[in-house]
Swiss-Prot record:
Keywords: Ribonucleoprotein, Ribosomal protein. This is Large ribosomal subunit protein uL30. GO terms for molecular function: structural constituent of ribosome. The keyword Ribonucleoprotein applies. InterPro entries: Ribo_uL30_ferredoxin-like_sf (IPR036919), Ribosomal_uL30_bac-type (IPR005996), Ribosomal_uL30_ferredoxin-like (IPR016082). Part of the 50S ribosomal subunit. GO terms for cellular component: cytosolic large ribosomal subunit. One of its GO terms (biological process) is translation.
């Protein structure tokens, strides 16, 4: 069994004034406020959300 890669995602900018789909991507990743961090699986679905709102986030491999 292989272990799945993990990504640490931190919200660095606010979602105030952003379009609804970008707010939904941030919420879908489990982020709630600036400097909030979550660890998510490195899947194509999560990568897609991260790429869409990359200007709001900081991403590190765990």
């Amino acid at each position: 069994m292989t272990t799945q890669k993990q990504l640490k995602v931190t919200q660095k900018r606010s979602t105030v004034g952003r379009i609804a789909s970008h707010k939904a991507c941030v919420a879908g990743l489990g982020l709630r406020r600036i400097n909030h961090s979550v660890v998510v699986a490195d899947t194509p679905e999560n990568r897609g959300m991260i790429n869409k709102v990359a200007y709001l986030l900081e991403v590190e491999e765990c």
